[in-house]
């Protein structure tokens, strides 16, 4: 987390699963007041369409001007994903916000299937001289 314009993040995590209070990818839906996985594709772990949430009610992140959150995913942070996020916060003054995208721009993207997963793995291996773990 980069708080108020930091060049080096003051909060660093260990990856997606840990951020959402689990490990080794959720295999089944789970919900609690502060975090959960209401939708998971059990056969493919995080791949496919997975919905997760985490509320910072008991551990808020305080900021004054800006907040940038990044998250690590995949071995050595090398996995490409299409992620959508939402953030809620409290502020003392109201300000105008940008217009939301129209309905066509907000429609769901197609699910990733096993063929797509295979294609992504093969493309990644090619960038690593066909060594599954890189050089």
Pin down the residues of each PLM region.
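Beta-strand-centric surfaces of beta-sandwich/beta-rich domains
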Residues: 1-134
């Amino acid at each position: 987390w980069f708080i108020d314009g930091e060049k080096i993040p003051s909060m660093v995590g260990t990856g997606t699963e840990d951020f959402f209070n689990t490990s080794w990818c959720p295999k089944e839906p789970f919900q609690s007041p502060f975090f959960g996985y209401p939708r998971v594709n059990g056969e493919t772990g995080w791949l496919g369409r997975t919905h997760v949430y985490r509320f910072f009610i008991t551990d808020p992140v305080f900021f004054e001007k800006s907040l940038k959150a990044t998250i690590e995913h995949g071995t050595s942070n090398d996995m490409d994903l299409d992620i959508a996020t939402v953030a809620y916060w409290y502020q003392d003054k109201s300000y105008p916000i940008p217009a939301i995208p129209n309905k066509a721009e907000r429609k769901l993207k197609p699910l990733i299937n096993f063929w797509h997963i295979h294609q992504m793995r093969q493309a990644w291996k090619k960038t690593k001289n066909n060594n599954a773990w890189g050089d």
